[in-house]
Amino acid sequence: MLDALHLPGMTRGNVQVFTRVSTVTNTQWLTWQKPRGVSMLQAIVIGGGGGGGGGFTRAAAAAGGGGGGGGSSAVTRITIPAVCVPDQLFIQVGAGGQGVGSGGGTAGSGVLSYICIAPDTAAANTLAVSGAAAAVGGGTGTGAAVGAAGTAGTIATIGAMPLAGLGQFAFIAGQIGIAGGAVAGAAGGAQTIPVTSVLTTGGAGGAGTTSADFAGGGFTAITASLLSEARPATPAAGTVAGSGGFLLGPPRYPLFSFGGCGGSAANATAGGAGGNGGPGSGGGGGGAGTTGGRGGDGGGGLVIICAW
């Protein structure tokens, strides 16, 4: 059989996926063992997404803002000759931030993910880290203001992962979450599918209300886009939770993670909860109501190591 373009055969690769998360840096390490006979490795490193803020709890016909969606993690990718790395690497997968309910303040931030040559995240040990700053959670709505959008995770720097100089590396910033719907009453802010090459998305905003029901935020449609066709469904108005995010992948889709949709707002009943984010993506904000909806949790991180 001819070797087309001198590329390795499809059956010769080794792919390991790490998803068990750690809530505290430098604890709960996982290990990767170098497979026999490989010459190259590539890794995708994604941290935890930010949680969604809660919708405001208020009496019927009173003003209340929706919760803000959490930001998404930045993404780091490295490609290194296998001969340049030890036979064992240590992996930490960062947890997603927890969503909060009404009055809970800013939702939890995500935790960074790491690949290290020893079970310690000191820069001298680090082959790859998902970013410089983790994704931040969204803010909680009040009677006077909407919940703020959660800040996106920022790109890593080579100074924080100097061993990546053994190969090639790429850094991609995360996506900001979306603010909650207006206190006068409005649908939650919709999120957009990014065109920056990031694989994660921020969470959408929860709806606000004064005297009517409003839908939580979803994802804006894109014409003739396969990813757009697969996006989470936008919730209906009323006591309706936002759709949860999820991870797409082969054979039909590329690797891509959606954040959670925002919870809907209800004037005379409870607001809907925000949807949880997919891996590395933000949780949706909660909707306002007589009991404000809780924001969704940010998705836990993801580390994939391919060797061939």
Give the role of each language-model region.
Residues 1-40, 77, 174, 224-228, ...:
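Enriched but not universal
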Residues 1-24, 140-142, 181, 186-194, ...:
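Glycine-rich, low-complexity segments
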Residues 17-18, 122-128:
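Local beta-strand/beta-hairpin segments that build beta-sheet-rich folds
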Residues 21-35, 45-119, 123, 137-154, ...:
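Glycine-rich strand-loop-strand elements at beta-sheet edges
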Residues 131-180:
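Compositionally biased low-complexity segments at domain edges in trafficked proteins
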Residues 159-160, 164-178, 189-197, 205, ...:
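Chymotrypsin/trypsin-fold serine protease catalytic domain
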Residues 201-278:
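Long, low-complexity, polar/charged, intrinsically disordered or flexibly structured peripheral segments
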